[in-house]
Amino acid sequence: MAKRDYYEVLGVAKNASDEDLKKAYRKLAMKYHPDRNPDSKEAEEKFKEAKEAYEVLGDEQKRAAYDRYGHAGVDPNAAGMGGGMGGGMGGGMGGGMGGGFADAFGDIFGEIFGAGRRGGGGPQVYRGADLKYALEITLEQAASGFDTEIRVPSWENCDTCHGSGAKAGTSPKTCRTCGGSGAVRMQQGFFSVQQTCPTCHGTGKEITDPCPSCDGVGRTRRNKTLQVKIPAGIDDGMRIRSSGNGEPGINGGPPGDLYVEIHIKQHKIFQRDGDDLHCELTIPFTTAALGGELQVPTLGGKAEISIPEGTQSGKTFRLRAKGIRGVRGSYPGDLYCHVVVETPVRLSDEQKAILRQFEASLNDGGDRHSPQSKSWTDRVKEFFS
C-alpha cells in the first residue's frame, strides 16, 4: 500500500511553518498516543504515521528532499537503485542489497576482478510511488463489468519546466558536491562506501533559479484522468492493478503502479456470498398455507418460483445459476431465497371474526394442522415437568 502524503497526514498546507508543523504533530501525538489508546491498533498506526511525517517535515534538509522527490527522496533504501556489479562478474547486485553494502563490496571486487561499476557515474534513479484509488460500484455493475473513467490525484512533471525544476531560459547546474554523479564516497575503515549526495539528493544537479510554477520541485499536484476496465464478477475488496499509471519516476526511473480497490454498495435486496446471492422472500400467510406461484427478482430479471402448500418461515428455495459468475469462475453461482411468512396486521372486526372461525376449525382437526406447534408445546411441558 502506498504511503500517504506527509502534509496530508499532519493536516497542514505545503507551505506550513515549522511552528504549524509542530502544533499539528503534538495534537495528533496526544490524540493517538498508545498510552491513551492501549487496545487500539488503528491509533498505534496513526501515531507511528504522524511521527514518521514529522521526522521528515520537521527536518529542513529532509523536507526539501521530500518536497522535490516525494517519499523516494527520503527513503534510505532507494539509494541502492542503479548500483550493481558488471564487467567480469557478469551479474547485478543493485537495489535489493542497499547502496552501502553493494558499493563497499563493489570496490573490493572491482580491484580483484577488474569489474567496473555500472550506474555509479550518473544520478540516482528512483521508481515512482504507487497510487491507490477507492472505487464504489453497485452489485449490478460488479456482476456485469464495465469501463469507467476515474480522476486520481498525483504528482506529475511540471508543464512549465518539464520536470527540471529550473526557471524557463535556465537549466540546472552540475552539483558542486558530487560532480554530477548524485553520490559521494565516504571512507569507512577498509571500505569505500557510496552514499546519496546530501546537496542534490541524488539528482546530480543544483537549481540556482527555480521554476516559479513548481518552486523548483519539478512536479505539481493535480488530477489525472484514467480509463479503467472493471471485469465482470469482481468482488468487494479486490484490487485492479494498472501498471505504469502511478506517479512518474525520478531521474528516468520507472513510474509506479495504480491500484484501484473495489467497494460494492449494499444492495436493497441481495446479499452476496462469493458467487452466490441470498435474499429474503416475504410471502403472505395465505400463500404459505395454500401454496401458489410467485415472481422473485434476480440480477437478470424476474423468475417464477412455486410455493408448495404448508410452507414455513425459514424454508429456502434454490434457483440454480441465478447468482454471479466470478472473475475466474466457469459457471455462475446460485440464488437462495429464504422464506419469511408475514403475519397480517391492522385487521378489521370482520377479518378477525373470520380468523377466529378458522382457528376453531383447526382445533377441531387436532394436531394434524399444526405439527410443529404441537411438538413445541410438548417440549415445553417436558421442560417444566
UniProtKB/Swiss-Prot annotation:
GO terms for cellular component: cytoplasm. Zn(2+) 1 binds at C158, C161, C211, C214. Binds 2 Zn(2+) ions per monomer. Its cofactor is Zn(2+). It is found in: Cytoplasm. Residues 5-70 form the J domain. Coiled coil: none annotated. Its main location: cytoplasm. It comes from the Bacteria. CXXCXGXG motif repeats lie at residues 158-165, 175-182, 197-204, 211-218. Zn(2+) 2 binds at C175, C178, C197, C200. A zinc finger (CR-type) spans 145-223. GO terms for biological process: chaperone cofactor-dependent protein refolding; DNA replication; protein refolding; response to heat. GO terms for molecular function: ATP binding; heat shock protein binding; unfolded protein binding; zinc ion binding. Keywords: Chaperone, Cytoplasm, DNA replication, Metal-binding, Repeat, Stress response, Zinc, Zinc-finger. Pfam families: DnaJ, DnaJ_C, DnaJ_CXXCXGXG. PANTHER family: CHAPERONE PROTEIN DNAJ, DNAJ HOMOLOG 1, MITOCHONDRIAL-RELATED. The J domain is necessary and sufficient to stimulate DnaK ATPase activity. Zinc center 1 plays an important role in the autonomous, DnaK-independent chaperone activity of DnaJ. Zinc center 2 is essential for interaction with DnaK and for DnaJ activity. Belongs to the DnaJ family. Homodimer. This is Chaperone protein DnaJ. The lineage of its organism: Bacteria, Pseudomonadati, Pseudomonadota, Betaproteobacteria, Burkholderiales.
